[in-house]
From Swiss-Prot:
Range of residues in the leader sequence: none
Record GO cellular component, one term: extracellular region
Protein's organism: Latilactobacillus curvatus
Keywords noted in UniProt: Antibiotic, Antimicrobial, Bacteriocin, Secreted
Source organism superkingdom: Bacteria
Location in or out of the cell: Secreted
UniProt name for this protein: Bioactive peptide 1
Amino acid sequence: TPVVNPPFLQQT
């Protein structure tokens, strides 16, 4: 399963 990045790492 792919790991989802935490909100503070969601640099879009």
